[in-house]
Amino acid sequence: MTNTETAVFGMGCFWSAEELFRKIKGVISTEVGFMGGTVKNPTYGQVCRGKSGHIEVVNITYNPKIVKYTDLLNLFWNNHDPTTPNRQGWDVGEQYSSHIFYFTEEQRLLAEKSFEKIQKSSDLRIVTAIKKASDFFPAEEYHQKYFMKKNNSILNF
């Protein structure tokens, strides 16, 4: 297997985020799930009821020789609204908040640098949280590759 790295982003509904990233050249795999909460192995229901503190995230395994972490960050920033706390479009709740979870010091620094750049270009306050990655809990199978399974052509990234 090639040298791979992992990126995890929370940017609203994880179905849309996964659909965006899974199509990128250099992305080896994607998986939707939850990160950042206090309950071990939360269910989708627990997360949606606000009982676990988790964020809906997409877990991305990628080849850094083909796609850079900064490229993934740019996709993250350009495909959701980082100025709305606990909300993306019609989806409202803590689980939909904007998050970058980092695994390495380099990822943290790149995330913070990108945050500063976005903040300087915005009249609104950026509310994206940048946090050290914690345990990732995969969502139930029916959430995985949701739009691919549904053959939904509504999303055109």
From Swiss-Prot:
It is an enzyme of class 1 (oxidoreductase). GO terms for molecular function: L-methionine:thioredoxin-disulfide S-oxidoreductase activity; peptide-methionine (S)-S-oxide reductase activity. Its EC number is 1.8.4.11. GO terms for biological process: protein modification process. InterPro entries: Met_Sox_Rdtase_MsrA_dom (IPR002569), Met_Sox_Rdtase_MsrA_sf (IPR036509). The keyword Transcription regulation does not apply. It catalyses: L-methionyl-[protein] + [thioredoxin]-disulfide + H2O = L-methionyl-(S)-S-oxide-[protein] + [thioredoxin]-dithiol; [thioredoxin]-disulfide + L-methionine + H2O = L-methionine (S)-S-oxide + [thioredoxin]-dithiol. It holds the Pfam family PMSR. The active site is at C13. Keywords: Oxidoreductase. Belongs to the MsrA Met sulfoxide reductase family. HAMAP family: MsrA. Has an important function as a repair enzyme for proteins that have been inactivated by oxidation. Catalyzes the reversible oxidation-reduction of methionine sulfoxide in proteins to methionine. This is Peptide methionine sulfoxide reductase MsrA. It comes from Methanococcus maripaludis (strain C5 / ATCC BAA-1333).
